């Protein structure tokens, strides 16, 4: 039972919802109550979160090496224990040193528990057959904010922000730790997995070993650019379009469509993307982002333009998450997969940490139209990187 694909996917899906919901999304709800109660600026509160992202980038490669040596079960279990301790530290913080230390702990935990570690665990068990399970797993992760934003909100209302962080810590400890411990042990290869016979040999990677660094560089540029866009707009989209003349209520409900279409994009990939050329898949996911920004970069802030943006933006983000997990597997093979994800994650985490402050500066200095032009150009850079990847390495595969 515990070694079956349905159990593994369900267990990892639950733990991704809980881990993302607590370690990444909880701060969105609890930042202001913390700032008011502790007397700290919201800038400092979010600085702690940025420190977590930077730490995640620093420890990404050591964490990947540990996973490759000791396996996903031990890595994920340790990550859950570390994560619950970091969340507990947040609930007890009364000075700034402890607060920053808590985020440092959570930065380490995130590299041991979130998508990259879960993707690598699936590849450990299923090899190249993990592509479809990776796509399915991303559907679970898309629910994290939908579930944990209300949990954190109502917990804060009922028992305060400290109690809310304790709820987060308990969720990780009680739900994630035992589910991770039930994963198959290191070295086990699942014979009955998705798609093909478990005994069949893996096909040759599409990217030859001597060109691996070049391909990783191009993918890293694409992922870092998209991480910058996603994080910057998560923080600033609503106030930016309000300054363009849109009501706050309209901006709010339009922005909320992003999550719905992010999940829809992942679901469509599951239905129609099984045999899609990985280079084409990457081009489509980043190309949609370029199209999404075109009307906003031109200064359009009408409701139809904003609706079209949210729909296309959400679909693009949903697809890019799958690209991040599945395409490297096809391009580079299963061997060293965790290390490849770590190499791809590091620049993206740095971009994510810098994005809110950098984009706020652009908006303050030049306004939202220039800000959307910047996002449009960053999207073009991402699309250009995937086009260059396809031009350099496509071998007529499907």
What role is predicted for each listed range?
Residues 140-187:
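Helix-loop-helix hairpin linking two adjacent transmembrane segments in secondary transporters
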Residues 17, 97-113, 224, 305-318:
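Hydrophobic core of transmembrane alpha-helices in multi-pass small-molecule transporters
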Residues 58-71, 265-277, 363-364:
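Helix-to-loop junctions at the C-terminal end of transmembrane segments
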Residues 27-31, 212-267:
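Extracytoplasmic gate region of multi-pass secondary transporters
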Residues 275-327:
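C-terminal transmembrane helical hairpin of 12-TM major facilitator-type secondary transporters
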Residues 34-35, 66-67, 150-159, 241-242, ...:
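Interfacial helix-cap and linker-helix signal at transmembrane-aqueous boundaries
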Residues 81-94, 288-300:
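C-terminal ends and interior cores of transmembrane alpha-helices
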Residues 34, 112-126, 319-332:
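Intracellular juxtamembrane helix-capping segments at the cytosolic ends
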